[in-house]
UniProtKB/Swiss-Prot annotation:
Record note on quaternary structure: Homodimer.
Family recorded in the similarity comment: Belongs to the glutamyl-tRNA reductase family.
Protein name: Glutamyl-tRNA reductase
UniProt site (Important for activity): 99
Domain remark from Swiss-Prot or TrEMBL: Possesses an unusual extended V-shaped dimeric structure with each monomer consisting of three distinct domains arranged along a curved 'spinal' alpha-helix. The N-terminal catalytic domain specifically recognizes the glutamate moiety of the substrate. The second domain is the NADPH-binding domain, and the third C-terminal domain is responsible for dimerization.
Keywords annotated in UniProt: NADP, Oxidoreductase, Porphyrin biosynthesis
Organism: Pelobacter propionicus (strain DSM 2379 / NBRC 103807 / OttBd1)
Pathway: Porphyrin-containing compound metabolism; protoporphyrin-IX biosynthesis; 5-aminolevulinate from L-glutamyl-tRNA(Glu): step 1/2
Biological processes per GO annotation: protoporphyrinogen IX biosynthetic process from glutamate
Catalyzed reaction equations: (S)-4-amino-5-oxopentanoate + tRNA(Glu) + NADP(+) = L-glutamyl-tRNA(Glu) + NADPH + H(+)
Binding-site positions, substrate: 49-52, 109, 114-116, 120
Length: 436
């Protein structure tokens, strides 16, 4: 059985294509069931995020299974395959294992180290488990991917530094002001960057949030979302003294805060330090504000330097993550390869059990006066003999499977014992393999 991956991501497809191929979580049951109804696709999981759509599946026919999944994606979203195929990638066997381990560990993300992708894969797996489209192999595979991601996150510093301008602003504020607990933040503007900054500041312990925006209703909505207070834009300078941290991101064509404005506010605050972050382009705050006593001004360029330095650190840590992924690939691939011998082991045990049962019944028929206790002892003895005889060939077959050398042994056993094997795995034996 082989693991295959078919998908597209921010690296191969523009957003216009990704949004057309996305799956809605509210409507995921039908495509999951359609996926595993494809010829020779026995298990399937669909991962759909803003940056990637990927299908993880198991098949005996790598080329055929891959082609059928590509056709499934095109047909389901009503896109001509010849238009879609240029954006698709596919992996199988060890390359598929490596890819999913890297994706789960956020080594393949647009922002290396971001934590969202692991949760998104867990959610996708949850749907597959709920609708029973994942089985022994993908269950084991994805749980392994989750543990690999955990190793990467705990054994490296891949997620320890800010790589967004909004989070860099919080990191910088912490360095200047120390503990942010009890600090009040004022946002000038109500766009996406201000929203991200609000999340990060409040998560870092900031006490209060003030929002000043030219369109009061929009500022009011943002303030309400985070339990803050909206300030009419024309009252900005009357309320500025309440803020310890001011982040400005408007679309104004000129500066809106001059040194004289801040000088008056600082005096009113009795020269208690104020931290200004100007991430607007063109700038919102006159750079001469930085010359004032107790006023600290940083621009988007200052933050970008932090982001770039932290990104370089993350990339360095990512190389450690890649080493962890490579270590884990070998272990999982050994387990997957060992499943190739499962049908032969199942058939061999069944043949021995058939013979044991037949011979035991013949023996018991000849001993009419045998007590129930004696019959039980004979049952245990014959079962023990059978298990001891099968122990070595079973162990050899498992080791051969882990080394990718199953054919020689399985073919010999099938011929020697006239075994009829099927592709359906024995549940108990697979459980035994999983526990190893």
């Amino acid at each position: 059985m082989n693991i295959i991956v078919v998908g597209l991501s921010h690296k191969t497809a523009p957003v216009e294509v990704r949004e057309r191929v996305a799956f809605s979580p509210n409507l995921i049951e039908r495509p999951l069931r359609e996926l595993v109804s494809l010829d020779d696709i026995s298990e399937g999981v669909i991962v759909s995020t803003c940056n990637r759509v990927e299908i993880y599946a198991t098949t005996h026919d790598i080329a055929g299974g891959t082609a059928r999944i590509k056709r499934f994606l095109a047909d389901h979203h009503r896109i001509p395959l010849e238009s879609l195929e240029q954006y698709l990638y596919s992996y199988h066997s060890e390359a598929a294992i490596r890819h999913v381990f890297r994706v789960a560990s956020s080594l393949d993300s647009m922002v290396v180290g971001e934590p969202q992708i692991l949760g998104q894969i867990k959610t996708a797996y949850g749907y597959a488990a709920e609708y029973r489209t994942s089985g022994t192999i993908l269950n084991r595979f994805l749980h392994k991917a989750f543990s690999v991601a955990k190793r990467v996150r705990t054994e490296t510093r891949i997620a320890s530094s800010a790589v967004s301008v909004a989070f860099a602003a919080v990191e910088l504020a912490r360095k200047i002001l120390g503990d942010l607990s009890g600090k009040t933040v004022m946002l000038i503007g109500a766009g996406e960057m201000c929203e991200l900054a609000a999340k990060h500041f409040l998560t870092s312990g900031a006490r209060g949030l003030l929002v000043a925006n030219r369109t009061f209703a929009k500022g009011e909505r943002l303030a309400a979302e985070f339990g803050g207070e909206a300030i009419p834009f024309e009252e900005l300078f009357q309320e500025l003294h309440r803020a310890d941290i001011v982040l400005s991101s408007t679309g104004a064509p000129h500066t809106i805060i001059a040194p004289r404005d801040v000088e008056a506010v600082v005096k009113r605050r009795k020269f208690k330090p104020m931290f200004f972050i100007d991430i607007a382009v063109p700038r919102d705050i006159d750079p001469r504000v930085n010359d004032l006593e107790s006023a600290y001004l940083f621009t988007v360029d200052d933050l970008q330097e932090i982001v770039e330095a932290n990104m370089a650190q993350r990339n360095q840590e990512a190389s450690k993550g890649e080493e962890i992924v490579e270590q884990e690939i070998g272990q999982f691939h050994c387990w997957l390869s060992s499943l190739e011998s499962t049908p032969t082991i199942v058939a061999l045990r069944a043949r021995f059990e058939e013979i044991r049962r037949a011979e035991l019944e013949k023996t018991l028929c000849g001993w009419k006066d045998l007590s129930p206790e004696a019959e039980k002892r004979l049952e245990i003895m014959t079962l023990s003999i059978m298990n001891k005889l099968l122990h070595t060939p079973t162990a050899v077959l498992k080791r051969a499977g882990q080394g990718g050398r199953t054919d020689l042994y399985t073919d010999a056993l099938r011929q020697l014992f006239d075994l009829q094997t099927s592709r359906q795995d024995d549940d108990e034996l697979e459980l035994e393999l999983e526990e190893e």
